[in-house]
């Protein structure tokens, strides 16, 4: 199998083309293993589609399926344009709906669409939380110090609510810093696009930031978010790392 390794904002992905749908959970787990496989936060399979430029299957590091991945969608769009020679303005089908993307050399902007749902704030484990669905569910806690991030606490919240867990610090009305514990990876990752989107949207909804901000994830790779016409737009650089062939075990 020919595969391509991509990185976006600190998340890394294994991407390949396929001509039909099938359950690739075991393969995803094997490929994403950082000790015995290629290593990655996710596995993306690009499939043909009659109506849209393509359709994807997205698998988490542990082999579970995910409806959406923000950084994964940007990596997929970069791959589709630069490798599969698809038009730089494209739309593709995910489990969370249609994603629109624009590729400009190494920069990719995607629309995460309309926010699926937002729940009221609540208190748990000594912290204030809010749940926001940006294609996948995210718990968000606003804090003054990102050192509050606690993996064990995140594990408890993730298991109870079946959601990703984010800690966010507002630096000013145009800049946020975010740390995310991702389900499916079951650990903190260097970045999470849908998580950053959830943090930005809730901050904007609560009138703490402008409708256009920069966000710095743990990786330090700054990305941009904009909210306009009830849609959430996400832009940042994408890196093609390498391509190779993989022999199945």
Swiss-Prot record:
Q: Which UniProt keywords apply?
A: Amino-acid biosynthesis, Cytoplasm, Isomerase, Lysine biosynthesis
Q: Where does substrate bind?
A: 11, 60, 70-71, 164, 182-183, 193-194
Q: Which GO terms describe its molecular function?
A: diaminopimelate epimerase activity
Catalytic residues? 69 (proton donor), 192 (proton acceptor)
Which cysteine pairs are covalently linked by disulfides here? none
**Can you list the GO cellular component terms from the UniProt entry?**
cytosol
Q: Which GO terms describe its biological process?
A: lysine biosynthetic process via diaminopimelate
Which superkingdom heads the taxonomic lineage of this protein's source? Bacteria
InterPro entries on file = DAP_epimerase_AS, DAP_epimerase_DapF
- Annotated SUPFAM superfamilies: Diaminopimelate epimerase-like (SSF54506)
Cross-referenced PROSITE patterns: DAP_EPIMERASE (PS01326)
Query: Where is the major localization of this protein?
Result: cytoplasm
Q: Which reaction does it catalyse?
A: (2S,6S)-2,6-diaminopimelate = meso-2,6-diaminopimelate
The residue ranges crossing the membrane are none
What Enzyme Commission number does this protein have? 5.1.1.7
The pathway to which it is assigned is: Amino-acid biosynthesis; L-lysine biosynthesis via DAP pathway; DL-2,6-diaminopimelate from LL-2,6-diaminopimelate: step 1/1
EC class (word): isomerase
UniProt site positions, description: Could be important to modulate the pK values of the two catalytic cysteine residues: 138, 182
Provide the protein's localization: Cytoplasm
Protein family according to the UniProt entry: Belongs to the diaminopimelate epimerase family.
Q: Which NCBIfam families match?
A: DapF (TIGR00652)
Assembly, per entry: Homodimer.
Q: Quote the function comment for this protein.
A: Catalyzes the stereoinversion of LL-2,6-diaminopimelate (L,L-DAP) to meso-diaminopimelate (meso-DAP), a precursor of L-lysine and an essential component of the bacterial peptidoglycan.
The protein's name is Diaminopimelate epimerase
Q: What organism is listed for this UniProt entry?
A: Campylobacter jejuni (strain RM1221)
């Amino acid at each position: 199998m020919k595969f391509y390794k991509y990185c976006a904002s600190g998340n890394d992905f294994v991407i390949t083309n396929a001509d039909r749908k099938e359950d690739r959970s075991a393969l995803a787990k094997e490929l994403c293993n950082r000790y015995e496989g290629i290593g990655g936060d996710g596995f993306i399979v690009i499939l043909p589609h009659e109506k849209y430029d393509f359709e994807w299957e997205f698998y988490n590091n542990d082999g579970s399926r995910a409806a959406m991945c923000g950084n994964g969608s940007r990596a997929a769009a970069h791959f589709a344009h630069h490798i599969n020679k698809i038009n730089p303005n494209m739309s593709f089908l995910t489990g969370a709906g249609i994603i629109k993307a624009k590729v400009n050399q190494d920069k990719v902007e995607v629309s995460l669409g309309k926010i699926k749902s937002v729940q009221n704030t609540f208190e748990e484990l000594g912290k204030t939380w809010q749940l926001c669905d940006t294609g996948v569910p995210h718990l968000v806690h606003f804090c003054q110090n990102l050192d509050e991030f606690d993996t064990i606490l995140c594990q408890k919240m993730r298991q109870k609510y079946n959601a990703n867990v984010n800690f966010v610090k507002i630096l000013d009305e145009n800049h946020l810093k975010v740390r995310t514990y991702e389900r499916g990876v079951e650990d903190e990752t260097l970045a999470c696009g849908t998580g950053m989107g959830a943090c930005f949207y809730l901050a904007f909804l609560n009138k703490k930031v402008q409708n256009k901000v920069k966000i710095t994830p743990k990786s330090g790779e700054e990305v941009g978010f904009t909210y306009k016409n009830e849609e959430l737009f996400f832009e940042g650089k994408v890196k093609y790392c390498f391509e190779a062939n993989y022999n199945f075990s």
